[in-house]
């Protein structure tokens, strides 16, 4: 999953900091 911490990707909120 690409995004920041607590970033909502589409409808999948996550707490993974993968940039």
From Swiss-Prot:
> Domain of life, per the record?
Eukaryota
Could you tell me the keywords of this UniProt record?
Hydrolase, Protease, Secreted, Serine protease
- Peptidase S1 domain location: 1-19
Indicate how activity is controlled: Inhibited by the chymotrypsin inhibitor LTCI.
The answer, when asked if Transcription regulation is one of the entry's keywords, is no
* UniProt subcellular location: Secreted, Extracellular space
EC number(s): the record gives: 3.4.21.1
Identify its protein family. Belongs to the peptidase S1 family.
Kindly indicate whether the keyword Secreted belongs to this entry: yes
> What are the recorded Gene Ontology BP terms?
proteolysis
Protein name as it appears in the record: Chymotrypsin LT_CH 1
Catalytic activity from the UniProt record? Preferential cleavage: Tyr-|-Xaa, Trp-|-Xaa, Phe-|-Xaa, Leu-|-Xaa
Record-level Gene Ontology MF annotations: serine-type endopeptidase activity
Q: What is the lineage of its organism?
A: Eukaryota, Metazoa, Spiralia, Lophotrochozoa, Annelida
- Please give the GO cellular component terms listed in this UniProt entry: extracellular region
Subunit structure of this chain's protein: Monomer.
